[in-house]
Amino acid sequence: MDKEECSSSESGWTTYLSSPIKVDEDEVVDEDYYYEGYNIYNYSSKVEHEEERNKDSDDSMASDASSGPNYQRFHQKNKALDLKNGKNEGNSKSKNDDDHHNHYHDGKKTSNSYRKKDKKKRENKSTYRMK
């Protein structure tokens, strides 16, 4: 069959033949050029969509659970230590927690705010004595 005797259209990998028609040579489209342009367009739009999706997610390059943020690993490590030391989630506060957060040392508070107040008291006492 000659090209001028029938027309065809492509859909995916399948070629459909239709009834014979007369084709003007001016209207003949270079199929290789058309499909090459189509493939380039599809590829570039696919890349744009992937880039857009990746903008929303900062952890798109994360390969495993151990590559998460440091604070999560620190929190999980402390939780594991608490469970190992006999603390459970329902009773997460203990005397050791108080000691750690309030900085008890030899029965005295040594937190920054307490030290500042104590320093003011000592300064007031020393100025009172000097007068």
UniProtKB/Swiss-Prot annotation:
One of its GO terms (cellular component) is cytoplasm. The keyword Cytoplasm applies. Residues 46-58, 79-109 have a biased composition (Basic and acidic residues). GO terms for biological process: cytokinin biosynthetic process; cytokinin metabolic process; cytokinin-activated signaling pathway. Its main location: cytoplasm. Keywords: Cytokinin biosynthesis, Cytokinin signaling pathway, Cytoplasm, Nucleus. It comes from the Eukaryota. InterPro entries: SOFL. Residues 8-18 have a biased composition (Polar residues). A motif (Nuclear localization signal) lies at residues 107-114. Residues 1-21, 40-131 are annotated as: Disordered. It is found in: Cytoplasm; Nucleus. Expressed, at low levels, in seedlings, roots, flowers and siliques. Residues 114-131 have a biased composition (Basic residues). A motif (SOFL-A) lies at residues 11-16. A motif (SOFL-B) lies at residues 60-69. Belongs to the SOFL plant protein family. Domains SOFL-A and SOFL-B are required for function in cytokinin-mediated development. Involved in cytokinin-mediated development. This is Protein SOB FIVE-LIKE 4. It comes from Arabidopsis thaliana (Mouse-ear cress).
